[in-house]
Design a protein with these regions (language model features):
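A glycine-centered loop/beta-turn motif at secondary-structure junctions
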Residues: 64-69, 117, 146, 204-271
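Conserved small/polar residues in nucleotide/adenosyl-binding loops
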Residues: 507-514
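N-terminal Sec-pathway targeting helices
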Residues: 7-26
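A glycine-rich, often tryptophan-bearing local segment used as a flexible ligand/cofactor-contacting loop or short
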Residues: 127-194
């Protein structure tokens, strides 16, 4: 029988065509198996959250503890408010219980006994406000205390009096421009490299140090010491001569504070997150100009054959797990009831690829309209629409959550990224009250000129939602991005980055949707 079948096969005139057909069928079966595997793939890790009523905000965690640090400020001096606000947040995140005395409202003679504290933080440029109390502080340091000057000091008689003790050989009345900072290699993570400032100005006092000083950071040109320590008998002083204050440099001041005493330990987050905004989402149709020119393929093919394989290689090389935040459609309808997306193929395919890569799915929006009510005025900044009421906001999120479960049933999402980083007070309250599936909000960490973005601090909010802002973005590493990344790596031991899949379709980045 077998021989008979073989003779018939040999005489069959279309056998070559059958072979080709068999090859195509084999390829189809492989692709089908791969697609099914992608669709039902799930992450190999699970996220475990504390119950919302068990999560404790940082302020509550140190409330009632005895203050170990005394912060002396003089709010009547220029720039003190900004520096004080920065240091308060730094100390809160480092979990350092702090008592604050404002010399604009309190006589120096009424400063509490320094023996109650381990450290004294002086946040004022002109030390004259301390009067004779400055002498008492230096005696306390000699006996084993630790003092830090957080602001660039002004040259006065009081600075000249303590200068030799805190490592200053000589100083001038002039200030020099500090274009960047170079930490010592063993002082900070990322030390040994230079990080440039945006909008530098003459912020650092021109001075020379003596042999007591141990320099921890210098200016970009290496000429000006910016952070140094000096041992004073049994105690230690640290001086900051940066003169720039704000979120983007907190890590440098936290590192400076950690120099006080023989050792400093403080809690950090120790995590990294890499977000793919608008992913998965409806894939744009057509041919982007540069994709068509350089690759000769459609956007959909470019995503699957070039862009995603490249990201997978990066992920494998550096151990990255991407978090893709899903958007169901790019419509602008905020008034009608949500309508289910009909084309689910892109979502299940690219979402499955993400899960297969051991990534995570998050939420971005039913559409790309931020969660704001009619009382939010976009002005000339955006052409977005407002949602008519809280009920509509909840309905949009409910549809997104249901859609995610429909196309990626194996995934469990918990993080929400606001479109364009915009989230109103009412929208934020609605999430905490009515959408228990959202446990984390990842908006923006660094402030901008606009009042619309939802700017966050790392921590747990009163309603138990984790505030986990994103820090840097895009594919082009600029000076500001490097500075922010370095600072936060040393402040919270955190690295967060986000990018848009369609950034590569544009001549310039970032995307107009900007989140």
């Amino acid at each position: 029988m077998i021989r008979s079948a073989w003779r018939i096969w040999k005489r069959f005139r279309w056998k070559n065509l059958v072979r080709v057909w068999a090859v195509f069928m084999a390829i189809a079966l492989v692709l089908l198996a791969q697609t099914l595997g992608i669709h039902y793939g799930a992450t190999k890790f699970t996220l475990k959250y504390m119950a919302r009523n068990e999560a404790i905000p940082a302020q509550n965690a140190i409330m009632g503890q005895r203050a170990t640090n005394l912060m002396l400020v003089d709010s009547s001096q220029d720039g003190v408010d900004e520096a004080e606000a920065m240091m308060k947040q730094v100390l809160l995140d480092m979990k350092v219980p702090t008592a604050t005395v404002d010399l604009a409202k309190t006589d120096p003679d009424d400063i509490p006994s320094l023996n109650r504290y381990r450290t004294v933080l002086i946040v004022m440029p002109e030390l004259d406000s301390l009067g004779d109390e400055l002498v008492s502080i230096m005696r306390w340091v000699e006996g084993g205390g630790n003092m830090m000057l957080a602001m660039t000091p002004e040259k006065t008689g009081y600075l000249d009096a303590i200068g030799p003790q805190i490592g200053i050989e000589s100083s001038a009345y002039d200030y020099v421009m500090t274009k960047g900072i170079k930490p010592a290699r063993d002082f900070m993570l990322g030390g040994g490299h230079t990080y440039m400032f945006s909008g530098p100005f003459k912020s650092s006092l021109s001075l020379n140090l003596n042999e007591k000083a141990t320099v921890e950071a210098v200016s970009a040109n290496g000429h000006t010491p910016l952070i140094w320590s000096a041992d004073v008998r049994s105690g230690r002083t640290v001086t900051c001569n940066i003169g720039i204050y704000g979120k983007v440099v907190r890590g440098f001041y936290a590192s400076a504070f950690s120099l006080l005493g023989s050792a400093t330990a403080y809690p950090v987050i120790n995590s990294a997150a890499f977000y793919l905004d608008d992913f998965p989402s409806p894939v744009p149709s057509g041919d982007a100009t540069y994709i068509k020119r350089d690759y000769g393929m459609s956007i959909a093919d470019f995503y699957s054959k070039v862009w995603w394989p490249d990201l997978t290689k990066l992920a494998e090389r550096y151990g990255i797990r991407f978090t893709g935040v899903m958007i169901e459609n790019y419509g602008d309808d905020t008034k009608d009831a949500p309508v289910r997306q009909k084309d689910e193929s892109h979502f299940s395919y690219f979402g499955g690829l993400l899960l297969k890569q051991n990534g995570e799915i998050g939420y971005h929006g039913y559409n790309h309209q931020p969660l704001v009510l009619p009382n939010t005025d976009y002005g000339d900044e955006y052409a977005y629409h407002q949602w008519p009421n809280r009920k509509a906001v909840v309905a949009s999120l409910r549809e997104l959550i249901a859609f995610q479960k429909s196309v990626l049933p194996a995934a469990t999402a918990s993080v929400y990224v606001p479109p364009s980083n915009i989230l109103s007070k009412e929208g934020r309250q609605t999430i905490g009250r009515d959408v228990p599936e959202i446990r984390t909000i990842a908006s923006t960490y660094l402030p901008s000129d606009s009042k619309l973005p939802y700017v966050q601090e790392f921590g747990v909010a009163d309603d138990g939602i984790v505030e986990a802002p994103r820090i840097v973005s895009g594919g082009m590493v600029g000076d500001y991005m490097r500075l922010a990344a370095e600072s936060e790596l040393n402040m919270h031991f955190v690295s967060t980055h986000f990018m848009h899949p369609d950034d590569c379709l544009l001549y310039t980045s970032p995307s107009p949707r900007d989140a």
